[in-house]
């Protein structure tokens, strides 16, 4: 039965959805399919979210097969729009291919066509055009597979590091095993975040390759700087753990890196004044929850303090559960256009999966608190640690799902997905 439910969820997530996108094209000038009497001076594209104009690419294709890369810029009167000057055009059919990066760091590509003089067929897409704007990469439910997987793994390591350092810096002296785990987590988090950054730079590139010019532009803008700042803070935490041997300083850097994650992804584009602090607090709650569990399983079982440590961890976890649940609901209300999106969109179905995981984790916590912790004998402590290991495995799976969720397009009810407009949410 569980396998059937899992298979059903995967099938639903893999199915194409029409009501969701990262940033959707709302309108264009010239309009898609328009027939003009004379050559327009410029093209204007308006999207559903703020975009990073400096990272946009606009290409003009003529019926002769000629491709012209247009100089694009942001509309000074609208952060949702870009402008591109057009050369003088003769009569015939034309296609505008565009590739933009929305404020949440996700690439979107598409095209519009128009004619001058009389209705004409749009230019046939050539191999050269596909090379310039290559939107083909492994995708699941509209999310780029490799960046989302690396994001989930990196986030798991960073959150675990932050939480464990919090206990190590402000609780009793950490054991040798706990210090060793902190060392490995600091290295893993730094490497995985660096890998995610490279993967993201490839993801946002129009040609889906690591381009030095595009990387330089992306990292000099807020959308890329946020990723870079998080990586640097994590590297500083690793330095404090491995070289300086100062747990509290390492915790400060790791906590700052976790908080920096609040401005990355969907919150940067959708109600940021509420979404950013909500996500930041959400991540901190998960960090202390996961870190507490790791602190418990890495404690010295022979010292006889497992149950005492479990009581402290249980109290922290209870607070974390409440914080994570409340902030999760707030983000769901911001990102879901309607409650029906929970069951009709990939984002909603993924959110249901994450919520089910959190409920299961809460059930684990209740089982530990009221069934295993009251057991006074050593066997109870052993059983508790074994059960907590299972809870950690489930929590990592939920965090991986959260990393995937950050790349899944949120529902867009107000997007103008008209039939003649060709658009791809980096699919």
Roles of regions detected by a PLM:
Residues 6-14:
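Bacterial N-terminal signal peptides
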Residues 16-18:
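N-terminal signal peptide c-region/cleavage motif recognized by signal peptidases
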Residues 24, 83-91, 95-427:
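Polytopic transmembrane helical bundles with strong interfacial aromatic enrichment
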Residues 36-38, 75-77, 89-91:
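Surface-exposed coil/turn segments at beta-strand junctions on protein surfaces, enriched
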Residues 43-72:
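Short, surface-exposed alpha-helix to beta-strand junction/turn motifs within ectodomains of secreted
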Residues 77-83:
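Aromatic sugar-binding surface patches on proteins
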């Amino acid at each position: 039965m569980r396998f059937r439910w899992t298979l059903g969820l995967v099938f639903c997530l893999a199915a194409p959805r029409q009501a969701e996108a990262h940033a959707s094209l709302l309108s264009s000038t010239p309009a898609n399919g328009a027939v003009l009497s004379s050559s327009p001076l410029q093209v204007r594209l308006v999207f559903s979210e703020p975009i990073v104009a400096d990272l946009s690419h606009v290409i003009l294709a003529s019926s002769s097969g000629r491709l012209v890369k247009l100089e694009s810029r942001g509309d000074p009167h609208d952060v949702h729009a870009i402008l591109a000057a057009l050369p003088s055009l003769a009569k015939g059919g034309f296609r505008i291919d565009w590739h933009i990066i929305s404020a949440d760091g996700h690439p979107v590509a598409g095209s519009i066509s128009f004619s001058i003089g009389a209705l004409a067929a749009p230019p046939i897409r050539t191999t050269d055009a596909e090379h310039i704007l290559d939107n083909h990469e492994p995708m699941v439910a509209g999310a780029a597979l490799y960046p989302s997987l690396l994001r989930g793994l990196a986030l798991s390591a960073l959150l675990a590091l932050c939480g464990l350092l919090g206990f190590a810096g402000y609780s009793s002296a950490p054991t040798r095993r706990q210090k060793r785990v902190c060392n490995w987590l600091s290295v893993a988090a730094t490497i995985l975040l660096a890998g995610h950054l490279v993967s993201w730079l490839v993801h946002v590139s129009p040609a889906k390759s690591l381009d030095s010019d595009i990387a330089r532009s992306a990292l000099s803008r807020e959308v890329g700087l946020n990723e870079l700042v998080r990586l640097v803070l994590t590297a500083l935490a690793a330095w404090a753990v491995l070289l300086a041997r100062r747990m509290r300083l390492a915790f400060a850097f790791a906590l700052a890196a976790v908080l920096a994650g609040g401005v990355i992804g969907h919150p940067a584009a959708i109600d940021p004044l509420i979404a950013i602090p909500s996500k930041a607090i959400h991540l901190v709650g998960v960090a202390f929850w996961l870190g507490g569990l790791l602190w418990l399983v890495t404690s010295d079982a022979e010292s006889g303090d497992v149950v005492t440590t479990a009581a402290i961890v249980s109290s922290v976890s209870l607070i974390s559960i409440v914080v994570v649940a409340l902030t999760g609901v707030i983000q769901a209300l911001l990102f879901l256009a309607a409650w029906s999106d929970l069951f009709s969109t990939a984002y909603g179905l993924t959110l249901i999966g994450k919520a089910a995981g959190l409920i299961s984790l809460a059930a684990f916590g209740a089982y530990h608190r009221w069934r295993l912790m009251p057991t006074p004998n050593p066997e109870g402590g052993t059983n508790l640690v074994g059960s907590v290991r299972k809870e950690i495995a489930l929590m990592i799976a939920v965090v991986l799902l959260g990393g995937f969720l950050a790349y899944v397009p949120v529902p867009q009810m107000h997007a103008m997905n008209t039939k003649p407009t060709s658009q791809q949410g980096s699919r």
